[in-house]
Amino acid sequence: MKKVFLLAAFSLAVLAQAQRVEPQRNIYVNQGGRTRIVNAVDSIGFTPDQMTVWRAGDTTMLNVAGTDRITLSEYDTWRTQVMPETYWADFDYDIAFDNAADRQRIVPEPEITDPTDPCYDDFKAHHTWRPGLGVHITFNDTTAVITGDLDSITVTRNGAHVTVHTAASGVWFVLSGHSNNGSFKLYSEKKASVTLSGLHLTNPSGPVINSQGKKRLFLEVTGGVLNYSSLTDGPTYTKVEGEDQRGCIFAEGKICISGDGELYVNANKKCGIASDDYVHVLDGLVHVVNHAEKGKAIYGKDNIIIGGGVVRTYSDGDAGKGLASDSLLTVTGGLIKAITAGNAVYVEAEQDYSSCCCIKSAWNMHLAGGEIRCLSTGTGGKGISAGHEEVTPTKTYYRGKLTFDGADVYVRTGGTRFPAVKLEDSHGNAIGPAASPKGIKSADKMTINSGNIYVRCSGGAAAEGIESKRSIDIYGGKVRTYCVDDGMNAEGCNMHGGDVLICSTENDGFDTGFLIMSGGLLYTIGDDDEQMGLDTDGKTFLVSGGEIVALGARNCAPFNSSSQASVLCYLHKNVSGLALADATGNILKAIPTPYSYNPLCVLFSNSNIQIGSSYQILSFEHSFNDTPVTEYNFTVETSTTQLGSK
């Protein structure tokens, strides 16, 4: 039996109710060199053969004999062997909720002052509201007291269930108090505002807040830290003929959320916050827990817009989503933390698997600002996914683009593919449906203009980092991806700039149908067992600028028609470092190379390599402090020089 190292005692809050959660921690269980992430941990128990982890209202069972260690930060020795030290800290990030720290990040979306902007009307201050005190509804257990501007509304009350009809413009409501069996339902022909001020409301049989009007619903959260609001729905809804009831907070029209308070939503049926138009978060702290299978914490049919505030979602139902839109999704500011803990499920009607995803859009997604942190721990789980596939008898169409324009993105997945082993045809080709974990996925083209993107996928086989079914175009920004399967995978890549590090522990670093590179830094690392640092499938590979370092057991070489020279070298010995040097021994580029590579293959391409000049390849047995051994002396005569062979 392997020894289990328990490095800390765990007594952490259970994230199961729509209450203000205390800081929670993830643990990292190392099993056979792979790391499984278990989040929202409450406690851990042991028997001689089994370890039980209690978390978020359920349990995870792990085999003791197969566990190497448990840590509060990931146990990982591979990166220190294969990456230069400057990259190590790029993967030391975690995704967890922390009330104290998250509250400090609440910053409102800057006001839009241009009346022609599509989001101008989403700001409450840009509208005229009825004078006076508004309509105050105070819930008190089994009843509700309604005061204020009653001339503008018609009220029906059944216990603590309040229904309001109004045709007036600019009506505003203030909801407070508590009830374990209450709700607020609004029929309005005009826009309306609902302020939540210390409201604690549960509706066992339907939505807690339900707006059946097509106009905007302004949802303002006040009260700060001490007077937060919490809403909970039940696992079953009473049907209402001709009406949608998609979630704990539901509106037929747009939902615009603002205010300086905190809102906690506990959803059990479908969605936490849902709009048949779009949801726009401008300010406040919004925390949504969703327990439903295939449920969505925040859902916008046409769009989800996050411009400010703090948005946190936790989905533990199978195939659950954090933020999900049937069309567009846009982030321009704020802090998003999205965690999914459910597994993939097979959907008979679609003849395919549906898996969890922290942020999902069916069409285009634009990440133009803010900070986004995603963690998906279940089988087939994904961090960010844009677009969808349309399959016809003759062709598959990829719809929906993903664009990065300045956002800081941190993604982690800890799940494996489901089923673990795919079916194969008589030729050994994988067939049949499966759910594979992905860090970031785009159906159509992915464009990276700026920002910082960090992806870590450590669960196991098929855990890919960044994938596009079409091309990935990189103009700038910083990209770091470290995964079990392909670190980056695309139909092709046009790289004009940026700083990109890609690393795989069991497959190719960068698997792309073509690569056309004119600028930036591309450092890509593949597994030591027959895998490639850079695999272009033998297709177009042209280099006219920038720098490439590719480390693997094999690599593809640029076409000789490239205007920038490259050197591809093989080495059949175990060394800890390799360097490209000029003819006098001055090192131009040095990289770490673990002993496990045999053969070792490295591709260098940069502006220092000139046709007609002479160079050396130097090796270092133990460290860069050793006296180097000259492996190759050579002169570059063509755009691509190959030294040695497989």
Residue spans of the language-model regions?
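Positively charged n-region of N-terminal signal peptides that target proteins for export
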Residues: 1-4
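Hydrophobic h-region of N-terminal signal peptides that target proteins for export
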Residues: 9-17
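Cleaved targeting-peptide boundary
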Residues: 18-25
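N-terminal targeting signals for Sec/Tat export/insertion, comprising classic cleavable signal peptides
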Residues: 28-52
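Charged, amphipathic alpha-helical segments
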Residues: 36-42, 68, 559-568
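Extracellular interaction modules
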Residues: 37, 59-68, 537-543
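Structured surface patches comprising rigid loops and adjacent beta-strands/short helices at the edges
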Residues: 38-46, 63-75
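A composition-driven surface/loop motif
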Residues: 77-646
